[in-house]
Amino acid sequence: HEHRGKEFVGINRGEEFEWDCRRKMMRCWLLTRYTRTRWGWFNGITRRINKYLSLCLMPFVHRSKMDFAKGANWVSITQKCAEYVVSQKAFVLSRFNFTFCPDEFFLQTLVWNHPEFRQALYSETDEYEGCMRLIDWKRGNPYVWTSADKEELLHSNRLFARKFDLKDRKIIKWVKETFS
């Protein structure tokens, strides 16, 4: 019960945050669904068109400036926080429409700007400690945990881990048996 009332939301406000925020939240992104197709040449064309349109539309797009926060979209939040986020649907749709990667910003921004939920954050300084996910980006994109990683998983203070693969059924069975 030591974590009761905590919001496990990863917050990233590091050095690259300001640049990333300006790029993703203040510009207008129109063709994002077409930037990751199976045709590589088409991706490059749509990225260039999107950048051009974004720069042309910049003087006409008036996005409210706010205190943004960014983080992983894996969260565990209280029911009260979830109800608050859902109640902000109209604001989220109007402010985050035609932005890039809004799933990394909208919930974190709502929590960051709400005094009660911000105070309940498990960690304001470490994105993955904050969401209590054990995710290894240094060895993979993300790294896939295997049976060889049992000790690391066992000694982690995190509540969840990502990512596993059905190709290694032993680790999945071990996780179920050990933590259920």
Give the location of each predicted region.
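ER/Golgi luminal nucleotide-sugar-dependent glycosyltransferases, focusing on the catalytic module
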Residues: 1-180
